[in-house]
Amino acid sequence: MNRTVFLAFVFGWYFCSIALSIYNRWMFDPKDGLGIGYPVLVTTFHQATLWLLSGIYIKLRHKPVKNVLRKNNGFNWSFFLKFLLPTAVASAGDIGLSNVSFQYVPLTIYTIIKSSSIAFVLLFGCIFKLEKFHWKLALSVIIMFVGVALMVFKPSDSTSTKNDQALVIFGSFLVLASSCLSGLRWVYTQLMLRNNPIQTNTAAAVEESDGALFTENEDNVDNEPVVNLANNKMLENFGESKPHPIHTIHQLAPIMGITLLLTSLLVEKPFPGIFSSSIFRLDTSNGGVGTETTVLSIVRGIVLLILPGFAVFLLTICEFSILEQTPVLTVSIVGIVKELLTVIFGIIILSERLSGFYNWLGMLIIMADVCYYNYFRYKQDLLQKYHSVSTQDNRNELKGFQDFEQLGSKKIAPYSISVDLTNQEYELDMIAQNVSRSSQQV
């Protein structure tokens, strides 16, 4: 990937991710933000926007995607119940709890604690025998939770401060629950990949032809891969679309949206209160406390509700473009920098503060543990010799995704908290395409 293009995608990733985090905190913060009391309902609108955008994107940029939920003129309940529903419910819980937590915890604490999902990945990985127990991994989990405890620790004798601290602790548990669901979702995806090996017809055909999709050209000064037209044409004849996380988003978003909407109706009971909240009302008293609902305030409210959906969509495009061509270690390093920048911008823009030595120590411990985890994973990857997968050259060094032939084996994909969801959406789309091919062959 050209360096300028790579930096552009990284900037887009940083901007969308950091802006989205700050936006969500501002939207739900009851003290210094809009204080919207219906975070689960608001998240439902995000999913509706994602579904529409992903549908438009697939229509404009990709070949028609076969509906894996249709099987022999009927509904493919097996794929829906086994793959889509568990992933969608876990994702809805992850995102929903994250947004609810913004009512109680600052962005700085949220960002650092969210990194603890690595600990849940390791824990569940060992329980389900995806991970081989190693004392270094166990120590990493323990250190991670020690860091989380220090992040929320705030000694004080003031009653009001104790009440605030209780809310922060409650919000921190919500973030931990969100991280737990994130870890469970990752482990479940890996179990599905292990039990459903991905073998594409296109890959097999190219292999049988003893040809590569890309060839070397001695006259190519930049030593860039050149498309092997014969085998590329072979791929086109199959008429299959390339796996892409946007395909999965289009399938998951409606299920997540319905799950979140039902949860909101049962727990938040948002109607009719949402219409009198600050998101649909404007201050009309020139500095006073009077507000009213106008056409302008309604338009503003709708824009505020759908804007995060656009941010998540662009975020996914940038993440996937980086993952296609960038080694896992590089992605992890770039992701760690993004987390640090999120904390810094939270301090600058939202005027948040890490109060006291213990909070700073907790943040440093967690970030150091995340760095060590990624280094440990990198060393493991070198030993296990993961194969790369790339849309341009699958003979290059390790990239963010595994080769098709590795999926479903006893090896598992490297986990990165920064691009966790995009990785799993990509993997789930490969499972979907594999299931679709299998059902057509029956």
Swiss-Prot record:
Membrane-protein topology: Multi-pass membrane protein
GO biological process: nucleotide-sugar transmembrane transport; UDP-glucose transmembrane transport
GO MF entry, a single one: nucleotide-sugar transmembrane transporter activity
Glycan-bearing residues: 99
Localization of this protein: Golgi apparatus membrane; Cytoplasmic vesicle, COPI-coated vesicle membrane
GO annotation, cellular component aspect: cis-Golgi network; COPI-coated vesicle; COPI-coated vesicle membrane; endoplasmic reticulum-Golgi intermediate compartment; Golgi apparatus; Golgi membrane
Domain of life: Eukaryota
Keywords linked to the UniProt accession: Cytoplasmic vesicle, Glycoprotein, Golgi apparatus, Membrane, Phosphoprotein, Sugar transport, Transmembrane, Transmembrane helix, Transport
Cytoplasmic side stretches: 1-3, 54-76, 129-132, 188-254, 323-329, 377-442
Residues with PTM Phosphoserine: 209
Regions crossing the membrane: 4-24, 33-53, 77-97, 108-128, 133-153, 167-187, 255-275, 302-322, 330-350, 356-376
Phosphoprotein among keywords: yes
Spans within the Extracellular topological domain: 25-32, 98-107, 154-166, 276-301, 351-355
InterPro entries with a match to the protein in the record: SCL35B1-4/HUT1, TPT_transporter
Family under the similarity heading: Belongs to the TPT transporter family. SLC35C subfamily.
Protein's recorded name: Putative nucleotide-sugar transporter YMD8
Organism: Saccharomyces cerevisiae (strain ATCC 204508 / S288c)
